[in-house]
């Protein structure tokens, strides 16, 4: 029979619920048969309920477990009261003696097996197994098969040698402490050995069992929340020696201060400890058992019995834990109080499996303080074989000695990780062995080792020692406290569950698993480490993500056909934290532009129409007024940039007629102003067949032609005016274009490509890539008073910043950026900055108040301050606003008016900046107050208004959004655009955003 039962311990963990019931019966051998029968009738319902509970939860689904678990404890409260009283009255029954012979046999077998294991363990230790496999192996060795016996025996420490002889005589009540300890030993043995028989137990005993399991859960509860813990500790403290009392007070103080939120983290690390060194727990629960038993106090005994059977139950999960040493602490996150009931147990193990490296670290740390303590104890503690009284004294001394040490050790950060690992291995090797027979113990290590199970054990043992009458009240009090606790437990569980939504069973403890609260001095310190480590791990994780994103962008930029994926949630922040090289930024933006081009080949008009629909309300209400407010200097009547000039009006002016029609034109190539007279159909430079007229600018007119030498490739030919100044300007533009093209051989920077140049009839002709429209025409055609879609504006802004980047690399100022000088391709996806007729080298910046078209003129130009690349940035800002709204941002009639409009947006110009202006006196008085020059509407005379302060009154965001009802993603982008414009339109060029910063701005980086 004994032989048959040994494997059953190993193979049938699911029997353990029933087994634990049985063990309580055996433990309560003292209960007389007739008493148990009397109670049987009284508790019949309860008994069956309890039994069915265990059956149900053997294989029930997790949802059922959850549901039942919530309500179970409420109904058990009253039962517990009755049960506790009943158990007090019960005596010991000799009913189980018949089984003891078998037990003795089984014990011998177990001892032999344990000896073999000890040798194995020693070999492992000596081989200094430090690998993860070694740890796992050791976990297996001290696994579920041994756990019952090993842990029970270890629980009953030094008396294991006398076990077999004493088992039979142990059932009588004896007042001396040693005999009660022995009795508990034999009881625990019986329990573990006869697990498989336990279902057959009789009714009265089953009732006791129920009580036991209940009170066990109570006890477990006791160990759950720090505040409650401190209560029971206070009581224990009463009976402790003064030094012990002091020490435990320190501990309790530490544990109490964080109270419930820390309890959660403590429980986490405790549960981790439990997982990793089951040995430690066992010793802890052992202490708990001993502590609660006094010869005088049957009540204490019954409570203990209960706690023991629970511990037995806890063994299965612990064994599982040992086998899976790397388990996620996350499940232990919520307060240990969470799932005490058996229903929780099955849900635990799967969770345990998923330990991230970070978490493994954490658990390592939390484990190590205990292990260290054990080691230090080993060296210091007196031999275990002292009499109980003496042992108590030496323990208290030891504890005194150990306290500072534990505190020192408990800062897990200070311990190197490999140290911890080796210690953990050592403790694993040692602890299973140390719990076995004295012989083996001697072989493996000095008896001293047995002493040092865990800090918990240390702090608990005094409690065990105090068997005074006070103990009895304490038992009573703690029982009622437990009942109270169980009431509040449900609420707390609910709370903690809501906190930790990801994992229902996070932090749950299998029934019988105790939260190791007494190591709170270690754990409190650890709380913070755990959080910090989480932070570090998060930072590390983000860094890895950023690198992945950057890699993606690199590959994409290399492959011009591919485009950037939309993963990076906030590339802006990631790039900034990495401080990426400008090249990275540029490549990323270039890739983004290509993606936009590919995705939006045919969607430009659709997106503009969508925006029109959003703006319908605004247009209906007040578009006519707005036209008056912002006079359009590019009205149809005098627009020299209208799409095709071979219209009736132009034909009447003699432009665009075929020269064959009028032979007199043959010698008269140039008109009075020096413009070339274009003839559709003529061939320029013997290869460019002119088929259309594009327009006329200050410096030139532009025709469309096909290159006969290049398979009729379309080109745009710019024919410079034939006068000395214009030729000079044309040659300067040619020089800048060549420089820019040479600096951008791959055409990534969106400056117009120059193919070649030639002279035709004394006019300098520049041959460019063909582009269909400029942005002024696009706005007129698609977005009049409405503007373009935010997607288009974002892409255009990316491309404009790239163009500015190239200009800066070449030390060139464009000095005339505006929608008219930005050309787009047929699909309106790619733009090119053109018309470098006003461009200059950055060093040659002559101070002139009329540089740049007025609406796009930066304030530093107007006041005559020196300028640099910031003037082009300002122009781009004005252009972007215009592209999104369809309205000119600063439609000033004069330079003075331009300053007023700019200050209406940004506030008064800084005095420091005003003082540097050559033309400051035209706009500011001696006190640097702004002199606003306006024409009186009545008298039509100029009047000057002195403004000492100008408060910003223009709301850029309101102007951008207007009356649009934007979806959330677009609204976000508009807010980002507003932020970008605020930084671009700084009055002081020194504070204006740089090109690199603009390229890293969220508006540019984040996709829609």
Curated annotation (Swiss-Prot):
Give its localization: Nucleus; Chromosome, Centromere, Kinetochore
Q: Which cysteines are joined by disulfide bonds?
A: none
> Which keywords describe this protein according to UniProt?
Acetylation, ATP-binding, Centromere, Chromosome, Isopeptide bond, Kinase, Kinetochore, mRNA processing, mRNA splicing, Nucleotide-binding, Nucleus, Phosphoprotein, Serine/threonine-protein kinase, Spliceosome, Transferase, Ubl conjugation
Record carries keyword Nucleus: yes
Regions of biased composition (Basic and acidic residues) lie at: 82-91, 247-270, 316-325, 395-408, 415-429
Set out the biological process GO terms recorded for this chain's protein: mRNA cis splicing, via spliceosome; regulation of mitotic cell cycle spindle assembly checkpoint; spliceosomal snRNP assembly; spliceosomal tri-snRNP complex assembly
Phosphotyrosine occurs at 140, 850
Q: Which residues carry this modification: Phosphoserine?
A: 8, 20, 23, 32, 87, 93, 131, 142, 144, 166, 239, 241, 257, 277, 283, 292, 294, 328, 354, 356, 366, 368, 387, 427, 431, 437, 519-521, 566, 570, 577, 579, 581, 853
Put simply, this protein is called Serine/threonine-protein kinase PRP4 homolog
**What organism is listed for this UniProt entry?**
Bos taurus (Bovine)
